[in-house]
Amino acid sequence: MRFLLAFAFVLLSAGLASAADKENTLYIDLKDNCRVVIEMRPDLAPKHVAQIKKLAREGKYDGVVFHRVIDGFMAQTGDPDGTGMGGMGERLPSEFSKEPHGRGAVSMARTQDPNSARSQFFICFKDSNFLDGQYTVWGKVTSGMEHVDKIKKGEPPSNPDKMIKVQVAADAKD
């Protein structure tokens, strides 16, 4: 009997962990049915993750272009105007951590004011440790980095790639 109860507890716990993971997983769909999967890290940046989820759930990121893509550095998006000068949502206080800006790190863009992040974010193509402790890391690409590598380069790129659809995995229909 104890074995059955223990087994049931393990199964139930695994199901709860899976649901929690979906709540903290972001899907970014790009052209050609390519998907980028990001593990969001509310343990590092709870306010930033909450804002990203809110904007994704409101459809605010759908159709937004990658307006600044620097080869060997990063791909930046999240400005509804596509210029790099705009943003959505409230200004967020910095949530800097010791999390490194390695390949696939997802971090918030901001002005010179550390407390100015809103909706723009970038994905690192390679280690960018010079950003550590100065920008808020809120996630990491866990799948689809090969698609990020193919995003059109430029500042701004001509005919830029865009995020077709952005959704929290817990809300995804597919």
Language model feature labels by segment:
Residues 5-11, 15-174:
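Cyclophilin-like peptidyl-prolyl cis-trans isomerases
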